[in-house]
Amino acid sequence: MSKRSDYLEIHPYTKSIEEWMDDMLIPEEERGQIKGADVVALPVGYNGCEKSFASSTLDFIAYARQQGLFNVEICCPEYDFTNLELCSVKIRLGKFQLATAITGTIFWGVVSSYIYDLVKPLLPQITPIEHVESPRFHDAPEVSFSIVIPDSLGNKQEIIYDGPVEGIDKVGEVIKTLTNGN
């Protein structure tokens, strides 16, 4: 059963890492690394380019690896990576599948820190202005990402967020609920 509310969507997810590796034509010699990862970046597919990754995926992976809290890999052959840049101010992290529920809160901490580090330089500039012709120009940055995580019963759930930065705390709350079984 799917749930959707203000920029946040949660629904069951059934596709396995094995199926993703088959779809992405991952060579046998690269599969072990991906299977052994705590977190796997998956393609998001935009406008007919099904094997493409979000614009900030590689930067986020580099950031996550620098933190050293979990092993992250990308589900893509080394020779075939397609990074899609879209013209907007939105931070597009992409889709990530977590191997265990335990990784969820750690991963969320890294995601929220990464987003904060990106928007921190913009925050002092974001001030409410009452009389503006185009108020969207002054809005806070937006972010989109998807996290596939096993819940406390072992069923995978996909959490999709696409909205303003100030609303991402809801995702952390959902992750805690899913992984604690509450």
PLM regions: where:
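Short, surface-exposed, polar/charged, turn-prone segments marking secondary-structure boundaries
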Residues: 68-70, 100-102, 176-177
